[in-house]
Structures are given as structure tokens and as C-alpha cells.
């Protein structure tokens, strides 16, 4: 696996050097994203602070939900376990899942043997479970852990979600008091939902769809097809506002829900995210060590040139 990664890195250096240079003038959207501060050498696997939550995680996270996790389950449970450990060996400590992902029941075994105190595990709850606390407790039991670092209300699309999901949100508050979860937040899939998340004092962590191409990002109406490329500026404005409130911001859909098959698109998106100081971390779905190696190299290069 190491050899595969080295070959991948050599390929990326040779094939994207000129492309990366050409993109320097095109990856940023003027006036929408704050420039990242220069603080010495930064890398994909730095431990970064998630807003003002007091929680640290690796800048690059491992997403276990590509195509609702079916991309990951296709490599088999043993392959998945090895891939999680490979990611950790490279310095990735942030692992992202959900009760709706096919990988959900695999996470506990996958992280077995890894130091729990060094991991950041984020999970999500969809819908409105009848017993929210029991659902959160099931996460703990499934992952063989006493606590979940970040628990999100998953896939909000309505601007009124903060009213409609109040019972669920109250249960999250109780779970945090019980120390079952360390932070609480939301993943949004429309601009109305994202604006509501920004306005709500309840939210501590925001999982936001972001890429400069506007692919699979938030618009006024929730869209699952990816056929509409949205103006990313309103999303960035919400990110800036929520960051200013001390919230944690994690970028998702960095590779356009896996549709960025052109390396230039992946490079452009990574550079955009790494140049944006309001984004604390990003999460990308992986199915191979080579993909992890590529993402780390792209992030490292983008940070060095930001």
C-alpha cells in the first residue's frame, strides 16, 4: 500500500504541477472567503481546533458515507478496517459516519486498537427518532465507545428545522450533559436550512457542502441530482458568519460528491477550501490508500502555496 501511495504521489507531482500553477489565479472567488493566515508549515494531518468547542481533529477527515457508505462496503469489512487503520497511520484522526450509512455497524471494529482519546468521531441522526437518547446511546454501543465527539442532526433542508426538530435538539442537549456527546450540530442541504443553522444559538458544529464549482452545494431549494451548479457565494457568507460566532465549520462535498473525476477539479476545490480560514477541516470519502495519499498531497501542496 505504501508503494501504491508513492506511485500516486509521483504521478500527481508530474501531472499537476503545471495545472496547479495555472489554477493559482482561478481557484479563489474574490471577496467571498477570508485568506488563511500564514502560521508556518501546515499539513493535512495537523490537529486543528474545531471552532471554540475546545475539540481538536485532523484537518482532513475520512468520510465513511460515499453513496451512503456503499462505496466503502464494496471493499469488504476487512478492507474497510485496514483502510481506517491506514488513514490513521497517515495522521488522519477524524472519522465521519451516520446511522444511515452502510458502514455504521462497521465503525466499532474498524477503530479497534486505535487510541480512542486521539480520535474525533462524528456521527449523524436522521429524522425524528421516538427516543432520541436511546438512539444516541446506540451509537455509543455500536462504536464501542463512551462518547461521540460530535453528533449532528442530519440532512436538514427546511428553514424551519430549528422549530420542527426542537424535541430532537433538546435531547442532544441532555446527551451532552450526560457526556455522551462532546459537541452538537447539523448538516444542511439547502440555503434556508443553512441560514437557520447560522442563526440558531444551539448549533456548535456545521457540516457544510462547499466547493468552488458549486456542485452538490446548497441552493434555495434542496437538490439531490447535482445537475444544478449553485453560486457558492451565499454559502461562503454563512460560513463566515457562523465562524465569527465561534462555531466549528467542516467542509463536505469537496470532490463534488465524488463526481470530480478530472484531477484539475479536485485540485481547484482543495485549494479553495484550504485558502478559506473560516473552514476548520474537510471530510472526503475514500475507498483506497491511493486516494488517501492523493488527498493528503493535494492538501499539503495547497497549504504550502496558500
Question: Predicted regions: what is each one?
Answer:
Residues 1-22:
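N-terminal secretory signal peptides and thylakoid transit peptides that target proteins
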Residues 27-63, 73:
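C-terminal segment of N-terminal export signals and the immediately downstream linker at the start
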Residues 50, 62, 95, 121, ...:
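Conserved, mostly hydrophobic/aromatic
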Residues 52-54, 108-116, 139-146, 198-201, ...:
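Acidic (Asp/Glu)-rich catalytic clusters
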Residues 65-77, 122-130, 260-262:
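Active-site mouth loops of central-metabolism enzymes
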Residues 74-87, 130-142, 190-195, 265-272:
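Short, acidic/polar
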Residues 143-159:
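Active-site groove signature of glycoside hydrolases
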Residues 155-306:
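Beta/alpha (TIM)-barrel catalytic core signal, keyed to glycine-rich beta->alpha loops juxtaposed to Asp/Glu
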Amino acid at each position: 500500500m505504501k508503494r501504491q501511495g508513492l506511485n500516486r504521489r509521483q504521478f500527481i507531482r508530474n501531472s499537476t504541477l503545471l495545472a496547479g500553477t495555472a489554477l493559482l489565479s482561478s481557484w479563489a472567488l474574490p471577496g467571498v472567503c477570508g485568506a488563511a493566515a500564514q502560521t508556518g508549515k501546515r499539513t493535512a494531518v495537523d490537529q486543528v481546533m474545531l471552532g471554540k468547542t475546545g475539540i481538536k481533529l485532523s484537518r482532513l477527515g475520512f468520510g465513511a458515507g460515499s453513496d451512503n457508505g456503499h462505496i466503502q462496503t464494496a471493499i469488504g469489512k476487512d478492507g474497510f478496517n485496514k483502510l481506517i487503520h491506514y488513514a490513521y497511520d497517515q495522521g488522519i484522526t477524524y472519522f465521519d459516519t451516520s446511522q444511515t450509512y452502510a458502514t455504521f455497524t462497521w465503525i466499532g471494529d474498524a477503530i479497534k486498537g486505535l487510541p480512542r482519546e486521539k480520535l474525533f468521531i462524528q456521527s449523524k441522526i436522521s429524522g425524528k427518532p421516538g427516543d432520541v437518547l436511546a438512539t444516541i446511546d446506540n451509537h455509543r454501543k455500536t462504536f464501542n465507545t463512551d462518547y461521540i465527539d460530535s453528533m449532528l442532526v442530519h440532512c436538514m433542508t427546511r428553514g424551519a428545522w430549528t422549530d420542527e426538530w426542537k424535541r430532537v435538539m433538546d435531547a442532544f442537549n441532555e446527551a451532552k450533559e450526560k457526556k455522551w456527546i462532546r459537541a452538537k450540530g447539523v448538516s444542511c442541504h439547502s440555503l434556508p436550512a443553512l441560514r437557520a443553522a447560522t442563526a440558531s444559538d444551539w448549533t456548535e458544529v456545521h457540516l457544510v457542502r462547499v466547493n468552488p464549482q458549486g456542485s452538490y452545494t446548497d441552493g434555495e431549494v434542496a437538490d439531490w441530482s447535482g445537475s444544478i451548479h449553485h453560486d457558492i457565494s451565499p454559502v461562503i457568507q454563512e460560513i463566515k458568519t457562523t465562524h465569527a460566532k465561534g462555531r466549528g465549520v467542516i467542509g463536505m462535498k469537496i470532490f463534488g460528491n465524488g463526481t470530480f473525476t478530472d484531477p484539475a477539479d479536485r485540485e481547484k476545490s482543495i485549494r479553495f477550501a484550504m485558502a478559506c480560514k473560516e473552514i476548520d477541516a474537510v471530510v472526503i470519502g475514500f475507498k483506497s490508500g491511493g486516494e488517501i495519499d492523493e488527498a493528503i498531497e493535494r492538501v499539503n501542496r495547497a497549504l504550502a502555496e496558500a
